[in-house]
């Protein structure tokens, strides 16, 4: 496989950007080697500058649920662009997308569009603190909620790959207001509430963890977190930046029957354009400026092209589309598990809907500690062999892979065939 142009571009990029990239996980630090520079994408495939063709399971880290360059999405975005790329004023497209969100998630009684998932989560935290008059928040070890200072405490994803439990530059006075507990461990969360309940403004969680690899909630865990929040007067914030409109038309909240006080969105809601949102209970959201005193603002919030992209993508995600995604994802997970068994490589294939992770472990992976115990060297060998055979997976053991409605049975078959060869390579690594 040719990589000469990617290598040359990476050399130039290292002179221009920290680590040669504009987001850490893209640098292949977790697996080694040279990141591929992508020139174009179509459907379920991406193509690099050297002409290599890959079945894409990164999908821009989740947003491309209908695949790349879907004609309906492209048409609606092009129509919006002809009208103007940004107004700094309200537009009808904001209402079209918001009404579609609330139709599918009626618990989102009011919402605010922002420009990223990080902006959504940090805004939700501010709103929770302002609404409750409390300062502390609780997050779960290994859950990643964006790059805001209050949430870079025991975060997963790229922070995990770098081996940093926290990021330098986060003041201790900020971090001390972020309490943590192990994911899937209700007794541990109860202890946190017993110790600090009167000062806790909110608990924020990924309902299905995606930034430690896919961690599946144990039965009763999510509802238990909700109930503890109710008992102690804290807000229950569900971070659906990754899961929203991906796991079902109602996201993870719809799938698991949750009713959050606040919910955050990103990724799918913008179909690949920069966008985020937070929303929830009417009485909570009515405290947000200009209706209330809790300040939040953004120059590009509600950008018309992002609104158009999200609206087009969500309209395409019918119940039939979700059924197709489930069938394809189940077939891929089963094929990967079988290929690993053939190679006698112990793995755990964790999956919820169209999110999955192959963990190189002989034990169940259900929290940050069990994820960190995985064999990242074997994952690195597996990743590079898959890349060589045309399957583009997330370049980290601690990330989720995604499928789209553009993926086909042939894509899955090609990927499983590549996995048979890749697991054989991984078996050679101790």
Curated annotation (Swiss-Prot):
Record's keyword terms, sorted: Cytoplasm, Isomerase, Porphyrin biosynthesis, Pyridoxal phosphate
Root EC class: isomerase
In-chain residues carrying the UniProt-annotated modification N6-(pyridoxal phosphate)lysine: 267
InterPro entries reported in the protein's UniProt record: 4pyrrol_synth_GluAld_NH2Trfase, Aminotrans_3, Aminotrans_3_PPA_site, PyrdxlP-dep_Trfase, PyrdxlP-dep_Trfase_major, PyrdxlP-dep_Trfase_small
Pfam annotation, one family: Aminotran_3
Catalytic reaction equation(s): (S)-4-amino-5-oxopentanoate = 5-aminolevulinate
PANTHER family, A to Z: GLUTAMATE-1-SEMIALDEHYDE 2,1-AMINOMUTASE, GLUTAMATE-1-SEMIALDEHYDE 2,1-AMINOMUTASE 1, CHLOROPLASTIC-RELATED
Protein name in UniProt: Glutamate-1-semialdehyde 2,1-aminomutase
Organism per entry: Anaeromyxobacter sp. (strain K)
